[in-house]
Amino acid sequence: MAPHATDRSVQHLVELEHGRISREIFVNEALYQQEQEQIFARTWLFVGHESQIPKPGDYFVSCMGEESVILTRDSRQHIHVFLNTCRHGGMRVCRYDEGNTTVFTCPYHGWGYATDGRLVGVPYYKEAYREQLDRSQWGLIEVAQLANYKGTIWATWDAAAPPFLDYLGEMKLYLDTVLDCRDGREGGSEVIGGIQKWIMPCNWKFAAENFAGDAYHNISHRSVDIVGIGPSGRGRRDTDERASARRVAASFPALGHGAVSFLQLEDVPYTPSYQDTPSVEAYFKHCYEERQRRLGAGARLLGLVGTVFPTMSYLARQPRSIAVWHPRGALKTEAWRWFLVDRDAPQEVKDVLRHYAMRYSGPGGLTEQDDMENWNYASAASQGTIARRYPYNYEMGLGLPYPDYGVPGVTTERIAEQNQRGFYQRWAELMEAPSWEVLH
């Protein structure tokens, strides 16, 4: 991929030493277009989960930034991600959200593509093309790199991007808290149910930074905390093992990732959290104790939320989920949410978690409505000529020491905004860097 040319300097918009972020980066359409080239065309993006395409020919239509892509498994069980556009006339070759096929056929002129991307069907190949068309050069456009990490599928359009595990860095430990089994085994998750999708009139960065480390906004969820939405039905959204734990925020400014987790100070016995359903309670009690046995002191780290830069966020507690904030304009975001369960969990457990997810998350869930209202009104209030003259304040924790809690990242127990500042540090670097070589 050719070096990228930046359109506009953004350093004056992100003044990290003073904790100031310009409102322009959330509302300016020119900056949004610059993001498509500088960020979404270069970074690693979450596409889907391998459990969505278990059989040869299975496909799931996803997005990478603004681009529609096809996640599919070919006849040899190899996973691919292709741009969802015909190489002849540009029409989408797959118009369904998911399914199974042997050939992706363009409905415009009929070109057909195998599930490995090869162009295998061209109407009037002999009569019109005189067999001169080199079909080997006109297959579907495939991503430059693809990675399967514990069942999650990631891709990038940039061949020069670092390998995925290097891109993820030590954020891996925190991402594992949502992907690993509840009993401490590595991986083992699967997607349950369909994908929640909805549109929000706000910039994608509001949602991404919120999950990266905003522990300051819980006042927004006060009503949810008092109505008994938690798994125990006793008022809090937290499960009980987190009640006596230290809340730790971890930032990775050089990478842009951020996470908030709980760190138990000592081994804590399991306390009931699913008392309304004895079989589910027994399952999670067993998982909790097995996790302590397998991981030892490592089991004291309990995941909460995080963001892998730029747009993949997760919730590691119930309802355990992955969210992606697809950009649709400077003032428009399409949110997608996947819900995860342990693949070998009993069906009754999966059913209970599915119902809890519907009550908790998405545009009809109790907590997501609070978040969307904040992001939407912040976007609306930042568009005016006068409003744009005044930056947002991200000073919290600025200049204070960061204690070492024995876990990766720049950490603090305080409610602070170092995670958000780290997110925007990486955003500004990518917006101006001509290539990955400069960023390494």
PLM-predicted stretches and their roles:
Residues 40-44, 91, 216:
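Generic structural signal for secondary-structure transition and capping sites
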Residues 1-12, 438-440:
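Basic/polar N-terminal segments that are highly enriched at the extreme N-terminus
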Residues 24-25, 29-40, 44-64:
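Glycine/alanine-rich phosphate-binding loops at beta-alpha junctions
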Residues 53-159, 163-173:
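Rieske [2Fe-2S] iron-sulfur-binding domain
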Residues 144-147, 152-440:
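C-terminal catalytic domain of Rieske-type non-heme iron oxygenases
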Residues 8-23:
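Short, contiguous pre-domain boundary segments
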Residues 42-54, 124-130, 303-309:
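Short Pro/Gly-enriched beta-strand edge/turn motifs at strand-loop
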